[in-house]
Amino acid sequence: YIVLQKTPNIRFHLPNCSNIGKRDTDKYTDLIGVHTDREFGHHPEELNIIFPITNMFDTNSIYYENSPNSNQNLYDFQSLKLNENNFSINNFNQCLHYNKINKTNITRVSLDFRIIPYSKFFIENKSSVSNNIKFQLGDYYILI
């Protein structure tokens, strides 16, 4: 069994915009929303799946560290490069990631959702920061 985020996130990363907001903790103005998903209460075993509808590359994509707590310079993070209809599984729950202003002329559209192997799932009394849905089966997650 797999625990699946019930409602996927649909991302639109428009030219000359970021698809996430700046945070007070951002050290640099051009690196926007530096965070791990765990900071927002997500389950420690959660994995991110990104399924692009359009090609993801350069500044219309996500920048991420190679491994958790890498102490990697933020400017050395890689851009996630994916062709449409491919997908990527990432540990953005533990790895820092951020956006930049999209300087390409391509709007990135992607479906982003989270999974947890059922064998690693346990109940935490936490809720989504953005919509206050509990990170529990039947609320934020479904079992497939």
Regions from the PLM with identified roles:
Residues 22-24, 48-50, 63-67, 101-104, ...:
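General "foldedness" signal
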Residues 72-144:
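Catalytic core of Fe(II)/2-oxoglutarate
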Residues 1-35, 42:
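Signature of the catalytic double-stranded beta-helix
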Residues 10, 15-17, 39, 54-56, ...:
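Short, solvent-exposed loop/turn segments at secondary-structure junctions
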Residues 8, 47, 109:
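Residue-level detector of short, conserved catalytic/binding motifs and their immediate flanks
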Residues 19, 58-60, 120-122:
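Intrinsically disordered, low-complexity acidic/polar segments
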Residues 26-89:
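Catalytic core of non-heme Fe(II) oxygenases with the double-stranded beta-helix
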